[in-house]
Curated annotation (Swiss-Prot):
Keywords: Autocatalytic cleavage, DNA damage, DNA repair, Hydrolase, Plasmid, Protease, Serine protease, SOS mutagenesis, SOS response. InterPro entries: LexA-like, LexA/Signal_pep-like_sf, LexA_repressor, Peptidase_S24_LexA, Peptidase_S24_S26A/B/C. This is Protein ImpA. The active site is at 64 (for autocatalytic cleavage activity), 101 (for autocatalytic cleavage activity). It comes from Salmonella typhimurium. Signal peptide: none annotated. GO terms for biological process: DNA repair; proteolysis; regulation of DNA-templated transcription; SOS response. Involved in UV protection and mutation. The record marks 28-29 as: Cleavage.
């Protein structure tokens, strides 16, 4: 997995982008035309980053987590202060490189790929070094032109 680091935006500074959050939920469509006002505002930095000093971004590479909603090229929001729990998607260090996998603590510690490809196998390293917990996955639905 190749890694690209991105500087986290400071939610309290000029990097903060507040956008309208509509109260209506949409069923695979747009907000109702009758909803002409936003009930509140949403700052994506505040929503995605609860601990700025412990949060960083990585770009996912590969297909080993495609059935867990992590696609090749997705932006991962990672919190180093979050305590890893069984079933969390984590960034772990294996042989000096980062990998994104599901953490299994039972019956024995393991890093599990969640893929539709049988080529990826569950890893059972002697020592698992967890670098952080993936708290959000940002996925583009349209290619940049």
């Amino acid at each position: 997995m190749s890694t690209v680091y991105h500087r986290p935006a400071d939610p309290s500074g000029d990097d903060s982008y507040v956008r309208p959050l509509f109260a209506d939920r949409c069923q695979a469509g747009f907000p109702s035309p009758a909803t002409d006002y936003a009930e509140q505002e949403l700052d994506l930095n505040s929503y995605c980053i609860s601990r700025p000093a412990a949060t960083f971004f990585l770009r996912a590479s590969g297909e080993s987590m495609n059935q867990a909603g992590v696609q090749n090229g997705d932006l991962l929001v990672v919190d180093r202060a979050e305590k890893p729990q069984h079933g969390d998607i984590v960034i772990a260090e294996i042989d000096g490189e980062f990998t994104v996998k599901r953490l299994l603590l039972r019956p024995r510690p393991a890093l599990e790929p969640v893929s539709d490809s049988p080529e990826f196998r569950t890893l059972y390293p002697e020592n698992i070094c967890i670098f952080g917990v993936v708290t959000h996955v940002i996925h583009r639905t349209r290619e940049l032109r």
